[in-house]
Amino acid sequence: KAPYRAALAAMIVVLAVACSGPSVGVDVKVEAKDPQATLDAALQADREFAAAVAKDGPKAAFLAWFHPTDSQFIDAGSYLKGAEAIAAPFEQSPPGFTIGWVPDSGVASPSGDFATTTGRFAVKMGDQTLQVGRYMTSWRKDEAGAWKVVMDATIADPPAPPTTTPDPDGRPG
């Protein structure tokens, strides 16, 4: 559990450095964009990606929205690189299997071509919730100007503590 939190923290630091602009002593000419407009566009892309998963299924949507080669997916049990590898586990998704998420915040670079969104996700099988947690998705504009996922990481919430029912004598059971 701790290594994944450390990995997520490291990604946030890298993103913060990337979004802070050029380093001291580096002469980089970047036309500044409105970071809020960039973030709004990335949040909209994230919502459209979630809608595509609901409409087209995870495999088709992941192939369409993840960058074909420069993308990575990290969760507690896997590290996958490239859209094909990331979409492959969804090849035979059983009926009733769904993944959904809602972005709630993010940050964007001043260059206007990179942003990270984060929010809550849920994985379900029919009415049964299999996993919920937080996700972080990093987006980069491709050569055509379309937003593509380059990094996606999830951290599941810890399981709820077991509930106990007192016995008739009032002792915890």
Model-derived segments and spans:
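Bacterial N-terminal signal peptides
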Residues: L8-A18
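A solvent-exposed, acidic/Ser-Thr-rich amphipathic alpha-helical stretch
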Residues: D40, G57-P110
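Bacterial N-terminal signal peptides that target proteins for export
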Residues: K1-L8
